[in-house]
From Swiss-Prot:
This is Elongation factor Ts. Its main location: cytoplasm. The gene is tsf. InterPro entries: EF-Ts_dimer_sf, Transl_elong_EFTs/EF1B, Transl_elong_EFTs/EF1B_dimer, Transl_elong_Ts_CS, UBA-like_sf. It is found in: Cytoplasm. Residues 81-84 are annotated as: Involved in Mg(2+) ion dislocation from EF-Tu.
Length: 195
């Protein structure tokens, strides 16, 4: 029985899920920790998807200025209530996002927000590079689309690998935060300055 309690404690620390949720996930997975983690992650994503339709009118504007004073970031992160906006988890998330923006230099929040001019310029570069390969046209088209898709994912904040943990994207970190705080959280906008 002690091993079951230890597993519950371990999963609660790792996932920040409630005790009953952890207990149910362990039961469903037959006591398998990896299976329980997977179940909790799926439930967290389902909760995040459900909450994503809720309006967010509260939040924080987080400021970060690099120690040398040459890089600065302002990011607006919204949530549903001022109570959540004051929690340490939410504040840490905002700080992490500001630090990520300072180091990774995204152009926009979501892939669909990538400026058309930048996309057209990148498409032109990719087409020239693909044409130099001497491949058939349909393969060249696929190469261009693949390179553009990769480039867009590197430029949009939500699809970038998270700077502190490259094993997950900023979007996945956002979903984890939604499941931790129990409210919808939205990265609304940001601005990055560099001398």
């Amino acid at each position: 029985m002690a091993t079951q309690i230890e597993k519950i404690k371990q999963l609660r620390e790792e996932t920040a899920a409630g005790m009953m949720d952890v207990k149910r996930a362990l039961e469903e997975s037959g006591g398998d920790l990896d299976g329980a983690r997977r179940i909790l992650k799926e439930r967290g994503q389902a909760i995040a998807a459900k909450k994503s339709r809720r309006e967010t009118h509260e939040g924080r504007i987080e400021a970060y200025v690099h120690f040398n004073g040459r890089v600065g970031v302002l990011v607006e992160v919204n949530c549903e209530t001022d109570f959540v906006a004051r929690t340490p988890e939410f504040r840490e998330f905002c700080r992490d996002i500001a630090l990520h923006i300072a180091s990774m230099k995204p152009l926009c929040v979501a892939p669909e927000d990538v400026p058309e001019e930048a996309l057209a310029e990148e498409r032109e570069i990719a087409e020239k590079q693909a044409a130099e390969m001497g491949k058939p046209e349909h393969i060249t088209r696929q190469i261009v689309e693949g390179r553009l898709k990769k480039w867009v994912s590197e430029q949009a904040l939500l699809t970038q690998p998270f700077a502190k943990d490259p094993g997950k994207t900023v979007g996945e970190l956002l979903q984890e935060t939604v499941s931790k705080v129990g409210e919808n959280v939205v990265i609304r906008r940001f601005v990055r300055y560099e001398l």
